[in-house]
């Protein structure tokens, strides 16, 4: 009698086990396809290092005044995804051109300095090569649906090296306040600068632990996650307002 009564529970347990196994196999199959059968290459990090120099700035060029974000500017993130403990072959990269902001320059002869600068990025418009990833970061990690804006504000005046006016790419350190995910931190970032008669271009990146800006590294179902550090990249192009 007891044996007969136990059969329904045993059968139900077996069905649950089979159902659970099917779900696990389906998830693992999807991840295998995602990471192995269809690996994607990442866009290269934003950089000016390999770019050709431009013509030296003309002696009569005036930089004093207000400059604003121009077409071609980009900002975004770069993270390495993982399948369990196995890193993917390339980075997940999301970028947007939805950037606004200005910089004010002063000039004395050939000496040029940035007196103030502030920029804002609409992180809700970040796009990668995966629509599913773009949807997930709205509610996990960056949580762009809750914190749709990231900003930077220059902390103190910044002089440009004299060699910047020779058309060469120069390397400087820029200190300012980054506000990401609603948290603000003062950071110093290495930046590449290139100056022409009509445009000032600044390219750089900031790598940080997710927790530094009160974020939690994204994880989807415990199967797909990212490493514990993220990189913010930017390529800002400024033209006279």
What are these regions (language model features)?
Residues 2-241:
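Low-complexity, acidic/polar, glycine-enriched regions of mature
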């Amino acid at each position: 009698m007891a044996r007969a009564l136990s059969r329904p529970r045993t059968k139900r347990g077996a069905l649950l086990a089979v159902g659970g196994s099917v779900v696990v196999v389906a998830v693992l199959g999807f991840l295998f396809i995602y990471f192995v059968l269809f690996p994607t290459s990442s866009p290269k990090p934003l950089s000016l290092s390999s770019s050709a120099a431009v013509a030296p700035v003309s002696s009569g060029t005036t930089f004093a005044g207000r400059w604003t974000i121009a077409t071609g500017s980009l900002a975004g993130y770069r993270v390495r995804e993982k399948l369990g403990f196995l890193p993917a072959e390339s980075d997940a990269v999301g970028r947007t051109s939805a950037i606004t902001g200005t910089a004010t320059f002063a000039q004395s002869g050939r000496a040029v300095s940035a007196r103030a600068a502030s920029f804002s990025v609409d992180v809700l418009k970040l796009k990668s090569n995966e629509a599913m990833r773009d949807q997930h970061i709205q509610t996990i990690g960056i949580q762009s649906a809750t914190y749709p804006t990231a900003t930077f504000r220059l902390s103190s005046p910044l002089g440009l090296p004299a060699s910047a006016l020779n058309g060469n790419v120069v390397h400087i350190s820029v200190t300012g306040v980054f506000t990401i995910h609603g948290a603000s931190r003062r950071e110093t970032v290495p930046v590449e600068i290139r100056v022409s008669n009509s445009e000032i271009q600044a390219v750089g990146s900031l790598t940080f632990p997710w927790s530094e800006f009160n974020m939690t590294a994204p994880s989807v179902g415990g199967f797909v996650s990212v490493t514990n550090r993220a990189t913010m990249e930017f390529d800002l192009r400024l033209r006279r307002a």
